[in-house]
A protein has these predicted regions:
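A structural motif corresponding to the C-terminal end of an alpha-helix
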Residues: 184-201, 228-241, 317, 321
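Loop/turn elements at helix/coil->beta-strand transitions in domains of secreted/extracellular proteins
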Residues: 36-39, 62-67, 116-123, 194-202, ...
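The substrate-binding groove and active-site-proximal loops of carbohydrate-active enzymes
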Residues: 160-181, 214-219, 298-301
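N-terminal module-boundary/linker segments of secreted carbohydrate-active enzymes
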Residues: 11-68, 77, 297-301, 316-326
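Conserved SGNH/GDSL esterase-like catalytic core that processes O-acyl groups on lipids
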Residues: 47-171
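Histidine-centered active-site loop/cap adjacent to the catalytic His
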Residues: 241, 264-326
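Bacterial N-terminal signal peptides
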Residues: 1-7
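Substrate-gating cap/lid alpha-helix
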Residues: 206-253
C-alpha cells in the first residue's frame, strides 16, 4: 500500500484550478499507477456527485484513468487497479460549523485508518452553503460593501447568514464564518499529523451555479468567500486547494465567464459557471444540451469531466509528481 507523500514546497504549491485541466494527460505512468492505489473521500451533499460523475466520464473517454466510485460505508477495499473516489456518507456544513461535527470528522478519519485501508485524500465538498436559505442581509460590510448570505445548519448560533471572519459576527449575528471552515481543516490536518495518520486533507472552493446568484449581490459575496479560501491556502505552501469554482468558471477554450452585479448603478463583476459547463456529452463525446440534471450534481457532464481531469493532476502531485517530468521524492 502506498503512503501519501507530503508535498514539497520547493516544487510549487499544489493548486488544482483551471490551468491544470489540460495537464492530466502529462502525468507520467508511475504516478498514474500511484493514483490507482488511492482511496479518496470527497464528502458532501448533491454537488459531491460531480466529483464521481466526472471520473466515470473520464474513464469512458480514456480507459487509462480507471476508477471505482462509491457511496457506501465501508468504502472499497484496497486495490492498485483503479482510483477509488466517492463519499461513504453525506456531509453538510454542520460538519465544520460545530465542535461536534468536527469531532465526528476526526473520528471518521481515525476509524478508517484503523481498518488498514486509510483515506489517502479527503476534502469537504461545499453545497450552496455560501448562498442559500439566508439571502444577503444583516449589516452592510464596511470593507467589501456587501451584505452576507449563506446557511449554517447545526452551528452554535443556529442557521444564519455568515461572513469571512470573526469580526463579521457583529454584521451577521453568527459566530460562524469562512474562517471556521478554514481553521477546522487546519485542525484535522494537525490531528492526522499528530497521530501519524496518512490522510491528506485538502481545501475546496464551492459551487458557482445557481441562476439567482448570476449577476447579484449573492453571487458577488460568494466570490469574496472563494477568494478568502484562496488567500488562506496561499499563505502556507503546504496547503492544497482543489479550486472547484475556478475550474467551472472557465470553458475548454480558455474563456472565463463573468457576471455583472448592478449595485445601484455601480457594475461589480464576479465569476459564474461557464454555460459550456452546464452542457452534456453524447456517446461520441460531442457537446449537447443538458435536458435535465438526472445525475443530480447541478452541473453538466462537460463541467464534471473538467473536475475529473484536474483531480487526477492533483492526486498525482500529492503522490510525488512535480508537475513536469520529475518527482518530489
Amino acid at each position: 500500500m502506498i503512503s501519501v507523500l507530503i508535498p514539497m514546497v520547493g516544487y510549487g504549491q499544489i493548486v488544482a484550478d483551471h490551468t491544470v485541466v489540460d495537464q492530466f494527460d502529462d502525468i507520467p505512468q508511475r504516478y498514474i499507477d500511484a493514483v490507482k492505489t488511492m482511496l479518496v473521500c470527497m464528502a458532501g451533499e448533491s454537488h459531491s456527485m460531480g466529483y464521481q460523475n466526472g471520473q466515470l466520464l473520464l474513464e469512458k473517454l480514456d480507459p487509462t484513468y480507471q476508477v471505482e466510485t462509491y457511496t457506501t460505508d465501508p468504502p472499497p477495499a484496497y486495490s492498485n487497479q483503479y482510483l477509488r473516489i466517492g463519499r461513504p456518507y453525506m456531509m453538510g456544513e454542520d460538519s465544520f460549523f460545530s465542535p461536534a461535527g468536527l469531532y465526528l470528522i476526526k473520528q471518521a478519519v481515525a476509524d478508517q485508518n484503523d481498518t488498514g485501508n486509510p483515506f489517502d485524500v479527503m476534502g469537504f465538498v461545499w453545497c450552496w452553503d455560501m448562498t442559500w436559505e439566508n439571502p444577503p442581509g444583516g449589516t452592510m460590510d464596511p470593507v467589501y460593501r456587501v451584505r452576507w448570505a449563506g446557511s449554517s445548519e447545526g452551528s452554535p448560533d443556529g442557521n444564519k447568514r455568515w461572513g469571512l471572519d470573526r469580526g463579521d459576527s457583529i454584521l451577521t449575528g453568527n459566530r460562524v464564518s469562512m474562517d471556521t471552515y478554514l481553521e477546522g481543516v487546519d485542525a484535522v490536518i494537525r490531528y492526522c499529523k499528530d497521530l501519524h495518520i496518512p490522510t491528506q486533507w485538502i481545501y475546496n472552493t464551492g459551487p458557482v451555479d445557481g441562476e439567482e446568484e448570476n449577476g447579484s449581490e449573492m453571487g458577488f459575496q460568494r466570490e469574496l468567500k472563494h477568494d478568502h479560501i484562496r488567500a488562506w491556502v496561499a499563505a502556507d505552501a503546504s496547503r492544497i486547494l482543489f479550486d472547484y469554482a475556478d475550474i467551472l468558471c472557465w470553458n475548454n477554450d480558455g474563456e472565463k465567464n463573468m457576471a455583472e452585479w448592478n449595485d445601484n448603478g455601480e457594475i461589480r463583476p464576479h465569476a459564474q459557471i461557464h454555460p459550456d459547463n452546464l452542457m452534456d456529452y453524447d456517446e461520441s463525446f460531442n457537446i449537447i444540451d443538458m435536458v435535465n440534471d438526472t445525475d443530480g450534481d447541478h452541473i453538466g457532464e462537460v463541467g464534471a469531466l473538467r473536475l475529473a481531469k484536474a483531480m487526477w493532476w492533483m492526486l498525482a502531485r500529492i503522490a510525488g509528481w512535480d508537475g513536469n517530468g520529475g518527482s518530489t521524492g
